[in-house]
């Protein structure tokens, strides 16, 4: 279920990224009408993605779940697990729309230089999710113990809270967010801009779809190695994602700064700033990787699982730590190419390596 949601989330990100290239450039040359047009285009992309994934999950949801369940997982009640997964997804349908709308607003805010509000809204969503997970999973404060369904409800609530915060703040600060004034007077997108967004955005969407699908296939391969491997992978990925935030945030920084400079026509400055940001990102991620390597034997001890799983998770964390500088370099290069509109090259670079790993 988590991997299916992961594919959906990345497809939303990839789909909106094409319009986001133009958002940053329009904002860089102070063209707020252009920003409004790209925001409207994002709505069509986001809502279309929601409709497509809802259709896929409704028609093929059970088959997608079953791909990660097989007889090789000792001690696992496949029927019960499938039932819990279906119950979870049935509730999670309701988080798709608020998540999509949130990304339309948050991505536009980031591309226009406002990065703090989306972060604060995300933190609020995490806190709401944690609190309601505790209440609804375990039945605290008089609430029923809903287990897996409770976890799904908590996630849905957190998505609505995040969406409400982002929308409310954006519309209350119209002097700062001038693009929001009149954005809903029409939902028309200029045909030429729409064609350019499709031309540049389609490769990004395809790239994210293939990449997330490849990661889901990789995890399906891990699931065939047994529950211990799956548990170790989950621990490793959870911890690694915390440390990866540094590299990922630098990628977004590159997209915003370089995109705005390109929009303002300052090519030489864009090249200079990009080189500095790439170097800083690699240096920062190297330091983060060293810290991660030092903590690799300790962090898995926080989990209530077997010693072999903890050791396997530690080994995976060491590998992830060693790759931190390389991840930072490729991530910032990815956003550099994206901000300059070289989106087709991203598929040529990333997908052959992804297929090699899976094969």
Predicted regions span which residues?
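Small-residue-rich hydrophobic transmembrane alpha-helices
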Residues: 3-55, 99-118, 232-296, 327-346
